[in-house]
Amino acid sequence: MEPDDARGLKWQGGTPPGAAALRAAPSFGAAASQVRAATLGNGLRVILWSEHKIPNVALYNWVHVGSRNEGVGTSGLAHFFEHMMFNGTPRHPQGDFDRLMEAQGGSNNAWTSQDVTVYQDWFPSRALELALELEADRVANLLLVPEVVENERKVVYSERRLRVDDSNAATLEEQVQALAFLAHPYRIPVIGWPSDILSWTMGDLRGFHSTYYAPNNCTLILVGDIDPDEGLALVDKHFGATPARSAPPPVRTREPEQQGERRLLLPRVGKNPLVQYAYHAIAATDPREPALNLLQTILVGGDAARLNRALVEEQRLAVAVGGGWPQGFDANLFHVQATLPAGQDTARFEAAFDREMDRLLQQGVDAAELRRAKNIAAADFWRGICTIDGKARLLGEYAVMHGDHRRLFAAPEAYEAVTREDVLAAARAVFNPRQRTVGVLRPLEPSA
């Protein structure tokens, strides 16, 4: 272990696990030495990766709060703060953040999930200090002005109406998610329930920001044209004075084992029947993660995926089949969603789907399917890691969701090492028909 830095920053050095075995990409293994990780005295985790090919920087601030941290009456607050964080501080009034970043040639974005809220900034390296000052300022000193809150409340409520309430697929998915989880807060929609959006109080907002927007609840990623020592000194300059706060309350609830299939029938105006399946899966830190990710590609990853070939191209029982598994701090759901042709019998589709899943659980996958999935995973990985934005995103994912940024450098070999037996074991662990929730949307004709 390396000694603490002179400024009291705890360096986390050492060789990333598995990096030496990346013989197919030795330059990537060597790149691990360019990554530096430190923890400020106030608990802020900082990870920096020097990449000098272009004079730009990508900054990701991962705030460890999502809808899983919300409760009765406060659903949607994590997503709401994604909006509010661009609305000013005493030092930088509303609009300053975007104006100052754009003047330097920079841009920004943000997104919220069930587990995290992530703020992204991209800018020329000459604007590094400005970006850090703006980011630190809004984390510590965000203004909550009642008129601005009400305006953003209307925006978020309209967003919910557009993205969820007016969408048959999104409405069905929201209700399936809520039915699949009896206890765990993954049942809460990220955007929030309508009544909660309309009733948050200023006290709710202040308490939420004070609890979760603290340096010891954030992970800051910097990738690009930066010197690690200079970059860390600037992070300490702008973030270091913000005091740590009490650790947020942990999410202790674990979903009880599902004892039998649950079903939901949703009559809605529309043309196409929809069928959605939700199976209880695993957490991102589970060692079976590579196998389940590859299985996801085999089942629903593209036109050549197994379910698309069988149910769309060959049997023509669906016009589209998709799905996925959102990796989270806790075990989330593996979703499979199908859009059926107008007039299609959903029972006929379900019988065919069950036959395909039975075949998977009995026979597993063949070598060609697994090879295709590995090729896709490798191509996606290297395509992402070749940009500073991809590096920043992946560093954050591994640091926050997988528990250690160094696992990133072992990811290619971890995926390549997956066997057909590993995939079959993951399939049997997840695709248990007794532990699934099925939602069926039956289309209705519009009323006259």
Model-derived segments and their meaning:
Residues 9-38, 137, 177-218, 250-255, ...:
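Histidine-acidic residue clusters that define the catalytic metal-binding segment
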Residues 28-60:
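Mature N-terminal segment immediately following signal peptide/propeptide cleavage
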Residues 424-440:
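Bilobed periplasmic-binding protein-like "clamshell/Venus-flytrap" ligand-binding domains
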Residues 87-91, 139-147, 365-366:
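Short, polar/flexible loop-turn hinges at active-site or ligand-entry regions and domain interfaces
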